[in-house]
From Swiss-Prot:
Residues 1-22 form the signal peptide. Contains 2 disulfide bonds that can be either 'C1-C3, C2-C4' or 'C1-C4, C2-C3', since these disulfide connectivities have been observed for conotoxins with cysteine framework V (for examples, see AC P0DQQ7 and AC P81755). Keywords: Amidation, Cleavage on pair of basic residues, Disulfide bond, Neurotoxin, Secreted, Signal, Toxin. This is Conotoxin Qc5.1. Residues 23-48 form a propeptide. Pfam families: Chi-conotoxin (PF16981). Belongs to the conotoxin T superfamily.
Length: 62
């Protein structure tokens, strides 16, 4: 009888099983952009606004 409270406490402290996605992916679902894609897009925006290439040899200054 002494083990029952200990067992219940350990059961409550244990992590639950990972949940399964209830909705399977359909052809209309669009995957979210990854962190790498977001960083790449963020770094490209200032270059596009200035009209400069990556090497700064063809900057037009517009």
């Amino acid at each position: 009888m002494r083990c029952v409270p200990v067992f219940i406490i350990l059961l409550l402290l244990s992590p639950s099983a990972p949940s399964v996605d209830a909705h399977p992916m359909t052809k209309d679902d669009v995957p979210q952009a990854s962190f790498h894609d977001d960083a790449k897009r963020t770094l490209q925006v200032p270059w596009m606004k200035r009209g400069c290439c990556a090497r700064l040899t063809c900057c037009v200054g517009r």
